[in-house]
């Protein structure tokens, strides 16, 4: 019997993206009686909702009453998948286009082993389909996260383990979600997929790349004040919730130096107010109450040591859209050297 799949599309002002995305989904080869499509609209101000209602009556639509952010919007879909006994949930960004067999290929990989909790499709750049957007994402030991293989030439790849899957195109096993939980709703947006991938590995689930499952992404790298705040804040949350205490102490010196560097960076870019808001967030007692509560849940479910987890982490930030001489010749060598030293100490 085929596996029942819910394809979840979080949508916000998606009029420019949804026609291509939904049209490509209408051509997929997976049995039509084995999947459903759910669009969760996060209070769009364009005519996205009307477009779906008028053109895609077969698609289930949930419209939020207020803007909840990427993490909670996806969680609405994931909880729907759990409540309605789906075997899988596939998270798909609205700015994507899929190959007809993308779902068949992803499920074929996932079904090989019950310990596979997530499978990412090969994500290619829509406007330059000869280049990769992501073939599995990387985690820097200080919480930075970036797309693996970005801008590399598209080539034949083998199925392999990856550190964490891009939330733009990932198949999640509902059984695994019932164990590790959904996205952390406190994240709002950014790093929620980093955190989930980390927690999957901690709970002894595997995260794999399905190279023959292909999705195209209308990706544009952006720098913004809002993005800076959430990415800085959430990388701290990921570290504080998932590392063991001893590991946090070991990375503390490097984290302090990085904090100083990030403050100067924020000052130069004019985003220093956002950096101060991050500091303010961590001075609030309720913040630490949430962190400790989440941390207890994560550590209670832990089956894998930090010694094993950190083998997947990197000491350099290698992402072409943010490369500069300071990062390449100063920051990366220093922080990578520190990482190579301390990871040999971590035995727990």
Model-derived regions: residue spans:
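Glycine-rich, basic loop-to-helix element that forms the pyrophosphate-binding segment
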Residues: 64-84
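Short beta-strand-to-loop acidic/aromatic patch adjacent to the donor-nucleotide binding site
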Residues: 86-97
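Conserved donor NDP-sugar-binding/catalytic core segment of glycosyltransferases
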Residues: 96-139
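A short, conserved alpha-helix in the catalytic core of glycosyltransferases
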Residues: 163-214
